[in-house]
Amino acid sequence: MNNKLVSHLLDSADPAVRAKAIEAAALARQWARPIQQELSDKVYDTLAATVCVIAPELDVADHALLVEYSLWLYLLDGRLDDFEHYGTRPEDVGRRVIAVLRGGRAEARADDFFETSLAALVEELRARDGCCGLLERFVLRLVDGVRAGVRQAALSRRIAEGAEPLPTMEDFLELAYRHVNYRSVALALLITVGEHPDSAAQERLDAALVPASRAVRLANDLRTWAKDAEEGTLNVVQLVAHDGTRMTPHAVRDRIQAYRDEQALLLDELHRSAPASAAALENNLRVAIDLYTVDDLQFDLPDAEQVVG
């Protein structure tokens, strides 16, 4: 585990947490062996360190499951973003994912790791969830994320072709925060935490994931604005709000903090009824945002201010 992100996450961690991260990364590498050529080697260590810091109390099997689902989302993004490489239209990818979510292993094509691994991941989450109801929310949020990803890929293509103008910041974010799939990842985390909150608490937890997802999407765009500009990918830093405000990096940071505050307010009353779940979501967002401040993830933001005027 020798990369800057892992060091940032684990340098101050308990030795037991470091050991769990190493084991979870090894299990994830074994899981991903059929498609290892699609993933960079350091992503296993980074994701394992991340989930172990977010929820150190979980056992290694739960950590590995969360890493594997995160890796599956990497595969999903690749298929939605790179039609030429995979030869499958984003719309068809979306239809297959939704079909597998509805039909399980019986629907998954046996020779397609992308589909069979999704069916297996959902089965593992279902076994941990029991009859709590979080799995149903997980499936709904993943379906919504897939549909948003398909729509965003189509929108980016139309804008690149000059067939559609740039959206406002608000219109873009309404689609982009769903595409980032933070909500399904967070719900998978809640399932592994195993607190089994009641339906009222679940509603509150689910609601808190909306501002959290927006904060994460904005933090991601703040990090990748230069690369996105080169590749012609939509990024909030190039957009204008409904009120005419240009989205400078400073304005984006302010909105990130506002969304973090909104999540904190929604979670505040859950510290009695669902304390473990609320704490997990707070820690999840804190770590997610923190990762975007690591030096090797940052771009030169003063130059960004000049670019957007």
Q: Can you describe what each PLM-predicted range is?
A:
Residues 1-309:
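Alpha-helical, largely C-terminal catalytic domains
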